[in-house]
Design a protein with these regions (language model features):
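Charged low-complexity interaction tracts in eukaryotic proteins
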Residues: 4-11, 16, 81-120, 164, ...
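Positively charged, polyanion-binding regions of nucleic-acid-associated proteins
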Residues: 6-45, 55
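Short glycine-rich, basic-tinged beta-strand/loop micro-motifs
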Residues: 37-60, 125-133
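Charge-enriched amphipathic alpha-helical scaffolds
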Residues: 43, 53-94
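Phospho-regulated, low-complexity intrinsically disordered regions of nuclear gene-regulatory
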Residues: 96-128, 175-204
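Short helix/turn-capping signatures at newly exposed starts of structured segments
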Residues: 125-153
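A cross-family detector of function-defining hotspots
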Residues: 145-179
């Protein structure tokens, strides 16, 4: 199948919404593999339309996306097989995308799981974080120390929204811009991480 949206060079592709989407998919698959181990199998990930809009609406004219809010149908067209660039399909494969009520299911083929496992560097921080929060008696002090192990330049702020107690993020790591939000449930601590635009949308 000939791709109609191939980009001429790596720099051009890296500035696109497709590249942002691919990074997000790979990050989540790596996190899942750190939690559950690697299996060469189909992975289904779910995104709200708002998150996908952030990937593409800030991606510039090289994606040929008109100004304005991208609808569910427009997003399905953007992610249609004949519009996926070769740079994306060569790594995580021919993804399949469906949507209902602005909730998108992105199906990554076994090739994608294998690619992430064999061709991307281990995320030691995520592996250590998952192991730490899975330890009985884990404390926020220990979690904060783990962040400092990887960078002296972090931000930690208390949250009072009823869902999370605080967030921690790396301030100068372009590869990890997530807000890591933590909640102490008494017997253990849970976390969720959000991209900056999604964090802003939630109004935490």
């Amino acid at each position: 199948m000939t791709k109609t949206s191939d980009f001429d060079d790596k720099v051009n592709y890296s500035a696109t919404g497709y590249s942002r989407l691919a990074k997000s998919l790979i990050d989540i698959v790596k996190e899942q593999q750190a939690k559950l181990g690697y299996r060469k199998e189909i992975v289904r990930l779910y995104y709200p339309l708002s998150t996908l809009r952030h990937f593409f609406e800030c991606a510039g004219t090289d994606n040929k996306i008109a100004a304005g809010v991208i609808s569910e149908q427009q997003m399905l067209e953007i992610l249609a097989p004949n519009n996926l660039p070769k740079q994306l399909t060569d790594s995580i494969g021919e993804i399949k995308v469906t949507a209902k009520n602005e909730r998108f299911c992105i199906e990554i083929p076994p090739k994608g799981s294998e690619y992430v496992y064999e061709n991307t560097a281990d995320n030691e921080f995520i592996s250590e974080l998952i192991a730490l929060v899975g330890t009985h008696g884990c404390t926020m002090e220990q979690i904060t120390e783990l962040f400092y192990k990887y960078s002296d330049d972090i931000e930690k702020k208390e949250m009072q929204n009823g869902e999370f107690d605080c967030y921690i993020r790396f301030l100068n790591d372009p590869d990890d811009t997530y807000y890591y939000c933590f909640h102490d449930e008494g017997c253990h601590i849970i976390y969720h991480r959000f991209l900056p635009q999604d964090y802003a949308d939630f109004g935490f």
